[in-house]
């Protein structure tokens, strides 16, 4: 929402896309959170106003974010798929009206354990697949908007590799040295 404060946990391709979405929606502050500080330059290029690495702080990351904002963020987005990070994203939200959105998919058969008071105070916790859009209707609109240059994807493409180097592309992704690779045939 316009003028809001957002925190994005995870700076892979999806997290960086969330940053672009927050910027397009008019967020006034976008805090990027990742344990790989090498990703911060790209996050700032795409709209993050602040970048923090949880490893650089003694306090839990939700307390760091509350300290940075004075009250917690309006919106948080967890795009990693880690249970602990999902709870931290919720706890980083403003206690009366903050909204936390889980985008990252955890490994199968994991349960979330959290303090229910995180919700009783007024926070909202929701999940989202495909950005909450209905693919039948939304994909054509998304493609049309891209073709009209309403948003750019080129900054997310970090490598172009021949198909014969597909394994190298996965290695780059796992090492955190790639956002998205395009394979050529």
Swiss-Prot record:
Subunit comment: Homodimer.
The EC number on file is 1.1.1.1
Listed cofactors: Zn(2+)
Q: Where does NAD(+) bind?
A: 10-15, 34, 39, 103-105, 180
Query: What is the official name of this protein in its record?
Result: Alcohol dehydrogenase 1
Q: Which PANTHER family match?
A: ALCOHOL DEHYDROGENASE, ALCOHOL DEHYDROGENASE 1A
Q: Which family does it belong to?
A: Belongs to the zinc-containing alcohol dehydrogenase family. Class-I subfamily.
Stretches of the chain forming a coiled coil according to its record = none
What's a GO cellular component annotated to this UniProt protein? cytosol
Q: What class of enzyme is it?
A: oxidoreductase
* Gene Ontology MF terms in the entry: all-trans-retinol dehydrogenase (NAD+) activity; zinc ion binding
Q: Which UniProt keywords apply?
A: Cytoplasm, Metal-binding, NAD, Oxidoreductase, Zinc
What species is given as this protein's source?
Anas platyrhynchos (Mallard)
Report which gene this protein is encoded by: ADH1
Keyword match Secreted: no
